[in-house]
Amino acid sequence: GKPVTIVEMLPSILYGNDSDVCRTMTELLTDRGVTIHTGAKVLEIRDGLTCVFEKEGQKLTAEGAVVILATGRKPDTAALGLEAAGVATERGFVLVDDELRTTVPHIFAIGDLTGKQQLAHVATAQGIVAAHNAAGAHRTMRYDAVPGCIYTTPEIACVGLTEEKAAAAGHPVRVGKFNVSGNGRSLAMVLGCHILAPHATEMIGEIALAIQNGLTAGAVSDTIHAHPTVSEILMEAAHDVEGLCCHKL
């Protein structure tokens, strides 16, 4: 393989995700020889191949055969004539309510240009809601149960709040954890789930379903999961919320 250097301006890679997941992925990448600089600001790209960045007051460089710039997205709505139509925007994003209506009631907007969670499956869900509402219904979008997937090796998947965000929101938080390497009744509402494991992106839908329908950790732990399957780690983690995990190493 080729040497890889990651330059990240925020305090950690995957910032905003679960802290345990961020830390573990950092360790996995480092063990594979990836050089990671966090809290670093890119200053310039010289000759298309040399990255000049600043970290802790020092100017550093990283060279490579390819430079990938991944700093987010911005809306491309300037040529759509939105202002003339009376559709309000903010920093180029189209303002919509929970029913996906713009400031012009008969005009709806979906997808990345709404400035919500910029994921393909969110746009699909928004499209369904908008279509129903355009036909006279009054459906609303929920963004608290949207799963997010990162297709690394191993995969990362998450849904709902992190432990830190749940605590900051004033929820009494209990955490259940289960190590996938050990894989071969609670009244607590499920607020979030964060997985770093093979097939994580296939498993996260179960917890999205739990959050969407207000299920408890007990509902997950009481559901018999087939063995051996990777998805049974969700049952084990739910058991661990009350310290009742049978197979935790």
Predicted regions and their residues:
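A Rossmann-like FAD-binding core segment of flavoenzymes
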Residues: K2-D98, S181-G182
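Flexible, acidic loop-helix segments that line cofactor/substrate-binding pockets
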Residues: P11, Y15, G39, I45, ...
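Electropositive phosphate-/nucleotide-binding environments in soluble metabolic enzymes
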Residues: S19, R23, I36, T61, ...
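FAD-site-proximal beta/loop scaffold in flavoenzymes
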Residues: T61-A134, G205-A208, S221
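Short beta-strand and adjoining strand-loop segment in the mid-core
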Residues: E54, D112-L119, C149-I156
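General small-molecule cofactor/ligand-binding pocket signal
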Residues: T35-H37, F108, R174-G176
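Flexible, glycine-rich terminal cap/loop adjacent to redox cofactors
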Residues: A135, V146, Y151-L249
